[in-house]
């Protein structure tokens, strides 16, 4: 009969493509609910890396995938996918998450932290000026007594 044709795309590859996305989603949800701060920097990075891995796996299906020019093209493709996905997901993250009510709480906390830092610096400068004033007020006078030699 004829020879068997190997499938170009193996369904087992989907496990390697989709499992990192699910793991990243669970990790980000865990971090979101366990920390008091909104970790918006991790979302674009994790999903950008996951999409980069997907493009790397999918680009292996090109014919003659190990040719020098095809490897260079795969490298450029992976970098472009990483950069575009990172910037697009970052923009979407900013639009969705930073407009939420929770982000306002975080922003108010950061502003409060800045005010506390400024107040503590002001208190330190007040203490320093007070200490300098007290130091300038005190005059140290030392009087040395001469010992009288006794003649016996």
From Swiss-Prot:
Compartments it resides in: Cell membrane
Major subcellular location class: membrane
Example of a GO cellular component annotation carried by this entry: plasma membrane
Membrane topology of this protein: Multi-pass membrane protein
Transmembrane region(s): 13-33, 38-58, 69-89
Record keywords: Cell membrane, Membrane, Transmembrane, Transmembrane helix
Record keyword Cell membrane present: yes
Top-rank taxon, per record: Bacteria
Name used for this protein in its record: Uncharacterized protein MG384.1 homolog
């Amino acid at each position: 009969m004829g020879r068997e044709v190997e499938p170009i795309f193996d369904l087992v590859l989907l496990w390697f493509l989709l499992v990192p996305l699910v793991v990243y989603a669970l990790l980000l949800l865990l971090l979101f609910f366990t920390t008091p701060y909104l970790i918006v920097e991790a979302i674009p990075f994790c999903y950008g890396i996951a999409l980069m891995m997907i493009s790397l796996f999918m680009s292996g299906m090109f014919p003659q995938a190990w040719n020098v020019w095809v490897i260079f093209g795969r490298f450029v493709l992976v970098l472009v996918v990483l950069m575009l996905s990172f910037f697009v997901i970052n923009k979407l993250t900013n639009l969705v998450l930073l407009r939420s009510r929770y982000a306002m709480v975080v922003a108010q906390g950061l502003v409060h932290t800045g005010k506390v830092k400024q107040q503590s610096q002001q208190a330190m400068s007040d203490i320093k000026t007070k200490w300098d004033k007290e130091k300038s007020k005190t005059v140290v006078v030392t009087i040395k007594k001469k010992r009288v030699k006794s003649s016996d």
